Design a protein with these regions (language model features):
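Conserved P-loop NTPase motor core of helicases/translocases
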Residues: 1-35, 78-79
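Short coil-to-beta-strand transition motifs
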Residues: 10, 203-210
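Loop/turn-to-beta-strand initiation segments
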Residues: 13-16, 40-44, 298-300
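Conserved Walker B
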Residues: 14-25, 49-50, 263, 268, ...
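Hydrophobic positions in the central parallel beta-sheet of the AAA+
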Residues: 17, 44-45, 150, 273
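Conserved ATPase-coupling elements of RecA-like P-loop NTPase cores
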Residues: 21-33, 49-59, 283
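Conserved helicase motor core of P-loop NTPases
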Residues: 46-195, 200-203, 220, 332-334
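C-terminal accessory regions
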Residues: 97, 207-334
Length: 334
């Protein structure tokens, strides 16, 4: 690991540090943050403790919210991502508490005054995938590709993984007459929507950034010819153009579909979610709540009935952590 620019020997100069999406912070990252804050500075942490817990050890944000006697804790009450009459908002809040948002699974259910939360239940995984792909193609015509996402629990090695869906959408969307690059089953072409999956400090591009391949060309590298490709990343206030070599292709992944973990912290006008029993070990209220709240305007939940019920009935959010050891010991002693 490269480490961090700031630490206890070279602290941040800011008097107030504000961190968003704190439910994603694991123990290692939190330790690095507090080590880099100068004495006397204030730390403000914002987040939703009912979303997915962080990748890695610990449940820092959830644990800190239990320390009501020593920390100042405020609860935000106004939702800005969805409208007040949104079915996305009302159903997400029910799911957050493990409450069924519908009477029973049916072929098609639309909830909310805005009719923005749609459920479609099928018994076959292929049927779910076909609806997702058809719905995606229709949605990008309305909202544009940057504002539409298919999100699923798992990356690969199962039905309806991001790998499977990305390959199918790439085959539909892109012209394969030009140069292509391939890693395993994934094929990259000019126009491919891609996500950076590792931090690359030298290129100043980071995990989770999404862009499009704009050029693939053959270049002379000494006595050998190799392929280079260019990706354009559009941020809210800037555009980054990054060139990669063929050997750096594993830093990218196709990004028409992504895992729910990867989508955390992002929002899209239209979100299409697929839940089936191949993902059964991951299915719980946190996963489904996180997925639904990625949607700003429209959410389509495609599910096997049993998988949906498993999400509502199951909660995996609680972790046994060292931060709460003192409280647990005191509770047992009393």
């Amino acid at each position: 690991q490269k480490g961090f620019e700031h630490d206890h020997e070279n602290p941040l100069t800011s008097d107030v540090i504000l961190i968003d999406e704190c439910s994603m912070i694991n123990s290692y990252v939190y330790h690095a943050i507090v080590s880099a804050i100068k004495e006397g500075a204030k730390l403000i942490m914002c987040g939703d403790n009912r979303q997915l817990p962080p990748i890695g050890y610990g449940n820092i944000f959830g644990d800190l919210l239990l320390k009501t006697d020593s920390l100042h804790i405020s609860h935000l009450t106004k939702v800005l991502r969805q409208a007040e009459k949104s079915g996305i908002l009302s159903d997400a809040n029910k799911i957050r508490e493990g409450i069924m948002p519908i009477e029973q699974p049916e072929l098609r259910i639309v909830n909310g005054e805005l009719q923005d939360m749609t459920y479609m239940f099928r018994d076959t995984r292929e049927g779910l995938r076909n609806i997702a792909i058809k719905s995606y193609l229709k949605a990008i015509e309305q909202d544009g590709m940057d504002e539409v996402a298919i999100i699923v629990p798992r990356k690969e090695n199962c039905d309806n993984s991001t790998l499977e869906i990305n390959i199918k959408l790439s085959d539909i969307l892109l012209n394969k007459n030009g140069r292509t690059m391939k890693i395993g089953k994934k094929e990259y072409l000019v126009g491919s929507k891609v996500m950076q999956v590792d931090n690359n400090y030298e290129k100043n591009v980071f995990n989770g950034e999404v862009g499009y391949i704009t050029k693939i060309e053959e270049v002379q590298n000494g006595k050998e010819k190799t392929l280079e490709f260019t990706v354009e990343f559009k941020m809210s206030d800037q555009t980054k153009v990054i060139t990669y070599t063929r050997n750096e292709l594993d830093q990218l992944d196709l990004a028409y579909a992504m895992t729910i973990h990867k989508s955390q912290g992002s929002g899209y006008k239209t979100v299409i979610i697929i839940i089936d029993m191949t993902h059964y070990t991951l299915l719980d209220t946190c996963l489904l709540y996180t997925a639904i709240t990625r949607a700003k305007k429209r959410c389509l939940l495609l599910a096997e009935p049993q998988a949906f019920l498993q999400c509502i009935r199951t909660s995996h959010n609680k972790r046994n952590t060292w931060m709460m050891l003192e409280e647990n010991v005191e509770s047992l002693a009393s």
